[in-house]
C-alpha cells in the first residue's frame, strides 16, 4: 500500500473543510463519473450525511460504513487486529487500512476514511481530543493527513 501525505491547507493557511466545498467537489465527481465510498469512525456518519444531502449523489456514492468500535473496523472493513493493537484505532495506519480495504471491497474509485478522538473525553497525552486522521484512497494510492483540532465535539466531527 503506497502511502503519501495530502495537504489540506489553503493558501490562507486555514484548513479547508468539506462543508464549504462539497457542492463543487460533488459536481466534479459527477461530471467525471467518479464513484466514492466512505468509512467513518469519529465523524459517526456525518461525512456520508453531508455527501448524500447533495443532489445527484446517488449516481456516484456507493456505500458508507460507520465503524465506531474496533470490532466493527475488523468485521466490516477488515482492519487488521494486530494493527489496531500495535497503533490503536486513532492512527495513520488504521485510517490507511480503512480507506484501502474499503476501496477493495466497494471497487469505488475514491474512498474516504476518518478516525480520531472527537471528545469531549477519551483523549490521552499521546492522542488528545481533537486528533483526527483523514484518509483518501485513489487508484490504490493512499493519502492520510493528521489534523489537530482545538474545538467542540460538533466542530471536530464535521
Task: Give the ranges of each region predicted by the language model.
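Short alpha-helical segments enriched in small residues
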Residues: 8-158
